[in-house]
C-alpha cells in the first residue's frame, strides 16, 4: 500500500521543495509513524487535477488524498466534497471518499496564525501580536482577513510574511500540538493516522 498527498501551493521548483519540507516537518512533529508521499501541486485547481489523475490510476489499497485551502468557512468538515462542490463546482471523483479531501480552513495562513508561540519564535520581538486575528473561531474568518492581518503583524520584521518561500519557512517551525486545536488540522491528523 502506498499513500500520496497532493498539496495546494508552491509553483516554482524551489517553493515546491520548501512546501514538501514544511509539511513533512509538521506531520513528523505530529507523530505520524508512516508518512505519505507529498507532492506540492501548485494552484488549487492543479492540486485537484493531480488528485483526480492519481485517484483514477490508484492500485488497490492505495490512499490518495489532497490538501487544499477551503477558501471559505466550511459548514461540515466531515463532508468536504459538499463544500468543494458548492464553492468550486468540483465533482467528487467516482469512488472517492470524504477522507480523501482534506481542507485547510480557510487557508494555510489560518494554521500559521494559530501558533502564537511559533510566530513569536520565528519573527522575534518586532512581531505585532495585537494585529493578528483573534484565536476564537479562527477557522470561520475570511481568508483575506487572516492573510492581511498576518502580513500587517509582520510588516516590521526583516522576514515579513509573504506567500511562497517565507510562508513555508514559518510553517515548518509550527507546533503540531498547538495546531491540533484547529478542527481542520485535527481532522487531517486523524485521517492520516487512520489511513496510513
Indicate residue ranges for each PLM-predicted region:
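Short, conserved secondary-structure transition motifs
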Residues: 42-46
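C-terminal accessory helical subdomains adjacent to catalytic cores in phosphodiester-
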Residues: 1-2, 13, 17-38, 48-196
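Short hydrophobic beta-strand that contains or immediately precedes a catalytic carboxylate
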Residues: 5-7
